[in-house]
Amino acid sequence: MGEESSFNTASAAQVVYIMGFAGAGKSTLAKEFSEFLRDLGYRVVIANLDPGAETLPYKPDYDVRSIVRLADIMRRESLGPNGGLIRATEIIVERISEVIDYLQRLARLNDWLLVDTTGQLELFAFRELGERIVTMLELPSVGVYLVDASMFSKPSDVVMTQLISLAIQYRLGINVITIVNKIDSERIPVRVLMEEFFFKPEDFKQRISGSDLGVLADLAYDLIDSITRYLPPTRVITISALKRTGFDDLYSILHETFCTCGDMT
């Protein structure tokens, strides 16, 4: 306590925390986007922070499963999957200094650090783990909130997605970009809906009034003004991580966000 960190962030990597609900395609994005960045000439490393991952499509440069694995903790402490994941994240927090030390060493030698977070969004974004890592790592950081395009079946889904994105942003204290994945399988024009939400909110309200019904629709309608007050208009980025489509746009908005890091307005 009381000692200043000797870690020099001036030449360290930019950190991208890839977050999202289970099945959003986080690990696929980590793999494919890392290769995209390497093709541009960058030095890129990937950290896996999911203790429950059985297989990964990439070879992690840091793997939290070296500290704890879900299957082991379930067997040892007679826990189910949900309790096991919570207990596993507690163990990671208990050994957080080890995690931070390794990530900082990786960051010293590379341009980008992609962090593939827990399969369950809430374990990283809304519990102690995410906040501790972001705060202690002390590196330029941006969050990517990855959303499966199939989750958008009606206009109010856009509102709820942006509400979650805003909550993550202020919980972790970093800029968060909402990225829509699996756009090749979308059933509705997600980009159109999201652009209307940001740039024509009154038209979007009318769309909700005309198509959505029930309490959730009423709540979404009332939330639009509050969300847009704190979440400024932004370009809508849609990708297919598997096919690497939209990666130029993703790279561009990440670059822009890092250039304005710290501006939460």
Features from the language model and the residues they span:
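Helical mechanochemical/support elements of P-loop NTPase systems and associated helical scaffolds
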Residues: 84, 88-99, 122-129, 139, ...
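Canonical P-loop GTPase G-domain recognition
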Residues: 172, 184-265
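Inter-motif core of Ras-like GTPase G domains
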Residues: 112, 126-152, 167-173, 177
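A contiguous pocket-lining binding segment that forms or flanks enzyme active sites
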Residues: 160-183, 192
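Switch/connector loops and helix/strand junctions flanking conserved nucleotide-binding motifs
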Residues: 55-57, 122-124, 152-156, 185-195, ...
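Nucleotide-state-sensitive switch-loop elements of NTP-binding domains
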Residues: 2-19, 24, 28-132, 138-142
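Conserved beta-strand segments of the P-loop GTPase G domain that flank and frequently precede/overlap
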Residues: 17-19, 48, 114-117, 144-150, ...
